[in-house]
From Swiss-Prot:
It comes from Streptococcus equi subsp. equi (strain 4047). Its EC number is 5.3.1.12. InterPro entries: Metal_Hydrolase, Uronate_isomerase. The keyword Isomerase applies. The gene is uxaC. This is Uronate isomerase. Keywords: Isomerase. GO terms for biological process: D-galacturonate catabolic process; D-glucuronate catabolic process. GO terms for molecular function: glucuronate isomerase activity. Signal peptide: none annotated. Belongs to the metallo-dependent hydrolases superfamily. Uronate isomerase family.
Amino acid sequence: MAFNDDNFMLKNEAAKRLYQQIKDQPIFDYHCHLDPKEIFEDKVYDNIVDLWLGGDHYKWRLMRANGISEEEITGSASKLDKFKAFARTLQRSYGNPVYHWSVMELKNVFGVCELLTEDNAEEIYHRINAYLVEHQISPRKLIADSRVRFIGTTDHPLDDLAWHKRLAADDTFETVVAPTFRPDEAFIEHQRFADFVARLAQATGRTITDFKSFIAAMEERIAYFAENGCKASDISFTEIVFEAAEPEQLDRLMTRVLEGYQPQPLEVKQWQTAVFAELCRLYKHYGFVTQVHFGALRNNHSAIFNKLGADVGVDSLGDQTGLAINMNRLLDHLVQRDSLPKMIWYNLNPSYNIAVANTLANFQANENGIAGYLQFGAGWWFADTKLGMISQMNALAEQGLLANFVGMLTDSRSFLSYQRHDYFRRILSTYLGEWIEEGEVPEDYQALGKMAQDIAYNNAIQYFN
């Protein structure tokens, strides 16, 4: 069987027919970690390592597993040596999604059809570098060539959004680049919580002395984001919790934490519950889609974390006792307060997929006739794989309506990652095609094609607008 050809990952004739209906659809990338400054400045790349390996902790993780020295991963080794080290690793990465992403990027972006190996790495390195300059490869060109219509970045609540404003005012750039409100530092276990409160007070001109004044200041920032095109929020929780507390308890807790007190686990849960509930109330009011990423155990290799910081490839998926009961209680609490916004829940540990999809199905009722009001998000991070995607879609199809799914997102720091949308579309086509081939659904290519088109693009547009 041919590898990485036009029928890559399309396992049956039905899949090939369905893929033809979605392969050229635009991309609505509603969540990523791209830098709007880089998009605005639009500098032409002259080295593949800067574009392909810089900041890519997926690749760094594999390179460490292959015995590559840190010098050749994040250190001061030459760019050519880093490229060769990755080529050496890529040869041994069969079965890992990074292999598929990489060969797709090499072929579809740079026209490199031969497989990258240690033997041809230097020649391909120089060839791609020449291609970058000759074809003026820049962030905006990569975005335009990938037919990206919308980009949702991930932004600190105190960001002035200057680069988003400049992009919005630039009539030469058609892609919408919208900020996303990401208030990780608003939670008391965060090491920069006290600093965040001080900066929040300064940014809003408010005196923050208690929980109520803290939330009022947060609302001011949410309103500012809304004024500047924000359509969504995001948050990352290690665990989903529900632990109620009285306002007076929250006031005392906040005062103590700002004085240097280390909160206890119960207090962390109480604060997380209260702050998230208030934020959801505000998100609903301002029309933000609320994204919740959960289940990551971060920065586990303390030496590497202390040297390089966060998001460098030493994170894991976690487990949680009582996920279903906490998630149900939290969502019910939001419903009772009329504070349930549109939400996308991204579960990192696939063993909880059915529980998550089943829980979300309890709370889909809404007065606005919105299909898929609560979304079970695509396979995230370590579940952003062929099996991870299938597991997520299986759970959603069995427990809800797959046809209402808002589909793929890159969640990436790389301008090359739009190939992941094509990867997803191929897997989706095979997934739906197998239903046809196995007689599980009618052989109705108009209906299944419409379903595939909706999942690939149309549902996301409708959901975020």
